[in-house]
Amino acid sequence: MGIGFGLASLLPAGAAQAVDLDTALKPRIIGDPNAPMHMAEYFSLSCSHCANFHKNTFKQIKKDWIDTGRLRFEFRDFPLRGPAIYAHALARAVPVDAYEGMIDVLLNQQKEWATAEDPVSELARIARIAGIGRDRFVEIIQNRPLLEGIVKIAQKGYDTWSIQSTPSFVINDEDVIRGDVGYEKFLSALNTAST
């Protein structure tokens, strides 16, 4: 069983490769790369629970765990609906140091683009604000190898951790937390994992 969720039908047949795939698909990690603990979040940019996590709980985790050097945090794509894969592609196509900012913008403006009558036009608007012109945006969302790479990240989460919904979190490649749970649940799991 795969996680395609119909995403394969959205992949263009023979789009140009204007994106550096090695850079675009490399892991997106914040925090000390040598931190003793690791948390990976499988998220969809069209998921309202993911947006809520990032607006609330993530800020506290970042302050208490990431910024203190105890945790490295990895963003892993798991697009759930059609336009989400384009949003993930857009985020991965910006420079690596702008990725987290683009994720913030896409999650904070989620209601504007994810539920729009024409979500691709709304994503193009966000791209323009970020300095990405229409032609470049079209190249990004039609880049089949980039889109396939994003699907492979999600598929690996499904195959390895049975990830089927977002947000889902893997702590130290051992424990899985599913859903937008509060900070206290993360605190308990992180404290347990750190001992």
Question: Which ranges hold each PLM region?
Answer:
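Soluble periplasmic/extracytoplasmic beta-strand elements of cell-envelope proteins
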Residues: 38-41, 72-75, 168-170
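N-terminal export signals
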Residues: 1-17
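A short beta-strand-turn-helix
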Residues: 20-37
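Proteins that catalyze or organize thiol-disulfide redox chemistry
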Residues: 18-22, 193-195
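Extracellular/periplasmic catalytic domains that process cell-envelope and extracellular macromolecules
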Residues: 33, 66-68, 162-164
